[in-house]
């Protein structure tokens, strides 16, 4: 089922309570809470945000962690996703574009990705890579390769620098593993 929701970072300057109020007014049913502003790891706010969200009849669709595959310790990010009741955790596929990484770097990132997918699956959480420039998801070729190398899912968003036909083709390719479409 498709449901309209909100990514909390759209309103970085608002509190979670203000975001929930805006969502209720707009008739939205779900939210992806951002880990860089609204639910930071270790801040012990995830459980509180979950209670508030669910108390208003809304659901958390994902935790936008901003975890990047080069970082260590994925566990604290998973702890936050679990405390939020998020079925999906959004992560970034590195800090460099696919053309900038050598084979060793790519293999290391994919190994880390697969480890993250395994850890998350143990908690019934799905790892979803954000489709984003300057990461391993910056090209259709690289994404197709990731689909062969890993069981990851994808948070797709349109590339503003691609023609419409290219965007639609890229979206169709990830549909079998699509967890979310970001539109803006």
Located regions from the model:
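Acidic/histidine-rich catalytic cores of soluble enzymes
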Residues: 24, 30-31, 114-184
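Generic recognition of short, well-ordered alpha-helical segments
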Residues: 17-18, 44, 72-76, 104, ...
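N-terminal pre-domain/capping segments
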Residues: 1-88, 114, 121, 153, ...
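Active-site-proximal loop/turn and secondary-structure-junction residues that shape catalytic pockets
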Residues: 10-12, 35-37, 66-69, 93-97, ...
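Surface-exposed, active-site-proximal loop segments in enzymatic domains
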Residues: 66-78, 94-107
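Active-site groove signature of glycoside hydrolases
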Residues: 81-102, 123-133
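Active-site-adjacent beta->alpha loops and helix N-cap segments on the catalytic face
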Residues: 39-50, 99-110, 138
């Amino acid at each position: 089922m498709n449901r309209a929701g909100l990514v909390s970072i759209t309103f970085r300057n608002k509190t979670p309570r203000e975001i929930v109020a805006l969502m209720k007014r707009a008739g939205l049913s779900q939210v992806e809470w951002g880990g860089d502003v609204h639910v930071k790891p270790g801040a012990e706010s995830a459980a509180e945000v979950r209670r508030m969200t669910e108390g208003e009849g809304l659901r958390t669709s994902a935790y936008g962690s901003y975890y990047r595959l080069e970082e260590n310790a994925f566990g604290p990010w998973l702890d936050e996703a679990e405390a939020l009741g998020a079925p999906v955790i959004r992560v970034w596929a590195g800090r460099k574009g696919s053309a900038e990484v050598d084979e060793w770097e790519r293999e290391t990132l994919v190994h880390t990705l697969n480890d993250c997918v395994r850890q998350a699956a143990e908690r019934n959480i799905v790892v979803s890579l954000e489709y984003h420039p300057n990461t391993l998801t910056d090209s259709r070729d690289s994404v197709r390769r990731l689909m062969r190398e890993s069981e990851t899912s994808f948070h797709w968003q349109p590339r503003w620098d691609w023609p419409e036909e290219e965007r639609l083709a890229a979206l169709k390719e990830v549909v079998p593993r699509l967890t979310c479409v970001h539109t803006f």
